């Protein structure tokens, strides 16, 4: 991988972090990120563009640790029912949103 690609990945990660801090809502960020991942997966990007977008932007924007921390806070309150509901809801909604993004991308191209 060329040095330029590393710079682009860094810039994409920086931009994603800025958006994540600006939005400041893990659930909303997760849904938007899943939709966009689904949308861009169908685009068949070049290897370097794929790395920039998925490794740089989306890995910082949709940070899995934000999702885990949210679930940890619920679990720490001892509310197992709420934990199970949110865990399943987040997984299912994100998967469906990604599929929807993929479908939309295919329909408009």
Curated annotation (Swiss-Prot):
It catalyses: fluoride(in) = fluoride(out). One of its GO terms (biological process) is monoatomic ion transmembrane transport. The keyword Kinase does not apply. The chain crosses the membrane at residues 21-41, 52-72, 84-104. GO terms for cellular component: plasma membrane. It is found in: Cell inner membrane. Fluoride-specific ion channel. Important for reducing fluoride concentration in the cell, thus reducing its toxicity. Belongs to the fluoride channel Fluc/FEX (TC 1.A.43) family. This is Fluoride-specific ion channel FluC. It comes from Prochlorococcus marinus (strain MIT 9301).
């Amino acid at each position: 991988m060329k040095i330029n690609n590393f710079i682009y990945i860094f810039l994409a990660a920086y931009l994603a972090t800025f958006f994540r801090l600006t939005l400041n809502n893990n659930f909303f960020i997760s849904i938007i990120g899943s939709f966009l991942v689904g949308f861009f997966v169908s685009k068949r990007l070049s290897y370097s563009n794929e790395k920039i977008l998925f490794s740089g932007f989306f890995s910082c924007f949709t940070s899995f640790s934000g999702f885990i921390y949210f679930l940890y806070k619920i679990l720490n309150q001892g509310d197992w029912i709420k934990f199970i509901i949110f865990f399943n809801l987040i997984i299912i909604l994100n998967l469906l949103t990604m599929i929807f993004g993929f479908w939309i991308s295919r329909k408009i191209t």
